[in-house]
């Protein structure tokens, strides 16, 4: 699953997803990105990996949380639509989440290549779904799952 020989897959980071929403996805075994949009899910392939970053614990709380909250592997080719109520029908994709611990971002900032401006590191998260390097992925995941 995370053996060094298996690093040909795409690694993506989803930012700006509150912790409570990430945990719903983890418990349900799915990813839902960019307010339920289909396109970012379609760009992913089986065996690709996703790391969730949560700036807040929930949408109503303004207190910063700023942790990597989940890591998982795309399990199949299917992107599907669900009816979540109140006219909201988001797209989802099946993910096999690893058991991991939530990890603060701050110790990683100096060493993450996708963060170009270390002083204003939050700018790196303005796009919802970004591909990250193998180096960045390994750095984060090794702390989250203690490989």
From Swiss-Prot:
It holds the Pfam family EVE. It comes from the Bacteria. Disulfide bonds: none annotated. InterPro entries: EVE_domain (IPR002740), PUA-like_sf (IPR015947), UPF0310 (IPR022996). Belongs to the UPF0310 family. This is UPF0310 protein in gntR 5'region. It comes from Bacillus licheniformis.
């Amino acid at each position: 699953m995370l053996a060094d020989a298996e690093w040909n897959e795409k690694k993506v980071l989803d930012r700006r997803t509150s912790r409570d929403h990430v945990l719903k996805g983890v418990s349900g075994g799915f990813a839902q990105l960019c307010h339920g949009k289909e396109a970012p899910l379609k760009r992913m392939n089986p065996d690709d990996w996703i790391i969730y970053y949560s700036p807040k614990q929930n949408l109503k709380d303004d207190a910063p949380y700023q942790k990597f909250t989940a890591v998982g592997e795309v399990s199949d080719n299917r992107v599907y639509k669900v009816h979540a109520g109140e006219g909201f029908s988001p797209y989802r994709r099946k993910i096999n989440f690893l058991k991991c611990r939530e990890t603060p971002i701050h110790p990683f900032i100096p060493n993450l290549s996708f963060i170009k401006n270390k002083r204003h590191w939050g700018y790196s998260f303005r796009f919802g779904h970004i591909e990250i390097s193998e180096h960045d992925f390994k750095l984060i995941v090794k702390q989250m799952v203690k490989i």
